[in-house]
Amino acid sequence: GAVCTSANAGIMLQWAMKQGDGVLFLPDMHLGNNTATALGIAPHERHVLRIGSKGLVEPETQALDRKLLLWPGCCAIHARFDPDDVREMRAAHPGCRVIAHPECREDVIAVCDGAGSTSYLIKDAARVAAEAPGSTLIVGTENNLVHRLAARHAGQCRIIPLGHAICGNMAKVTEKKLWTVLDAICAQKATPLAIEEELCPPARLSLTRMLEVCGQ
């Protein structure tokens, strides 16, 4: 196995497809679906697993022989967007460009002008600001990033969130908490995070594979 990021999911899925008869992509089914679409993997070659508290639900009824098996997880922030959000923004801001993170639903990505990882969204905002001054860019991702991009390119273009999308877990990381942790590390008083030794080799291997495949 190997890990991937939203930025290199396409490269890693292509690699994984060459390693065997099928791939289990987890944990985000939307990133898996959108990556598969970009690579030309047809919908009939994919299957979103039905998982219950005891594992697979009625496995005999599931298409487990598909080329791509998708774990039914998602990012709660990105999954809340729907195609109507895009249509409403286009109606409110004629001529706007709409981009979104690939952890959004596939039907949302289908009606956007572009989709990509966080780094893609940042680069696209900079490109629009430089090449299309005065234009409007709608960005479908966690709102704090959108607000930072709007502030960074203020006076060049208008950058607006696709909808309300605040991650409560990210919001738990505050400047005060970060300072407290860094101060504890400097004072050698930080609470160590222990990982079971037997988990380290396979985890390291999956990360190393990603770096090697992506040429990093």
Regions found by a protein language model. Give the residues of each.
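The feature marks the mature, well-folded catalytic cores of soluble enzymes
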Residues: 1-216
